[in-house]
Regions:
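Active-site neighborhood of HAD-like aspartate-dependent phosphohydrolases
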Residues: 1-43
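Asp-based, Mg2+/Mn2+-dependent phosphohydrolase catalytic module
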Residues: 1-3, 39, 99, 116, ...
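Conserved SAM-binding loop
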Residues: 6, 13, 90, 108-111, ...
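An amphipathic alpha-helix signature
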Residues: 21, 25, 46-54, 73, ...
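Phosphate- and divalent-cation-binding pockets in alpha/beta enzyme and binding domains
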Residues: 23, 52, 93, 118-121, ...
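Alpha-helical substrate-recognition element adjacent to the catalytic core
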Residues: 28-60, 66
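Metal-dependent phosphoesterase signature
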Residues: 31, 56-96
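Short, acidic loop-to-helix structural element flanking the phosphoryl-transfer center
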Residues: 81-110, 116, 120, 145-148
Length: 210
């Protein structure tokens, strides 16, 4: 009987907000907009690059050009790709927990709204990629979180039943995905969300992986 743990990436396994902030501020400054602090980025990071830039643009310019948004998003991704792990830190206890999972024959997977290539690049550069049996990004399927199929497709590919799986994430996007899929959900406290954790659906709440 296969068992699996499916993880979100940003804010769950890795504090990637500092590198995301640098990419965000690079494009915002280039196009004449205000920069943000890392705390602001933590509230936006779980939505993907396009939505992050979109939120910032809407704060400053209600009539911005859609083509500018597209170009800024592309430049954000290009900058981020080249600087993806300069400041990112693995969250406390993650490496030891993943080692425990592998030693107990638990299938480990990633379900992230990062593109698949960026997710794999980050995991490789922080030396975590070896632990994962499957990595699904925002562009792996035709849908992404909070669409439950992002998660259920992973489980089908891995041949794991829902009742034998757990999802671990840090935001309402992850929570909605797990709840819709009827998969038990562990919420990581202090993640990339604007909501108070007590208002986010979860079966269990943890502060880190120790």
């Amino acid at each position: 009987m296969n068992k699996a743990i499916v993880f979100d990436l940003d804010g769950t396994l890795v504090d990637s907000a500092p590198d995301l902030m640098d990419a965000h501020n690079y494009v915002m400054q280039k196009y004449g907009y205000h920069q943000k602090q890392v705390s602001d980025i933590r509230h936006l990071a779980g939505r993907g690059a396009a939505n992050m830039i979109l939120s910032s643009l809407r704060e400053e310019d209600k009539k911005f050009d859609a083509n500018i948004h597209k170009k800024m998003t592309e430049e954000f991704i290009n900058f981020y790709r080249e600087n993806i792990s300069k400041k990112s830190q693995i969250i406390k206890g993650v490496t030891e927990f993943l080692k425990w999972g592998k030693s107990n024959n638990i299938i480990l997977a990633i379900c992230t709204n990062k593109t698949e290539s960026l997710a794999k690049k980050l995991l490789k550069e922080i030396n975590l990629i070896e632990f994962f049996d499957y990595i699904a990004g925002a562009d792996t399927f035709e849908y992404r979180k909070p669409d439950q199929r992002h998660l259920t497709n992973i489980l089908e590919i891995l041949d794991v039943k829902k009742e034998n799986s757990i999802m671990v994430g840090d935001s309402e996007t992850d929570a909605e995905t797990a709840r819709s899929a009827k998969v038990n959900f562990i919420l990581v406290n202090g993640g990339y969300t604007e909501k108070d954790q007590k208002h986010i659906y979860h079966d269990h709440l943890i502060n880190d992986f120790t």
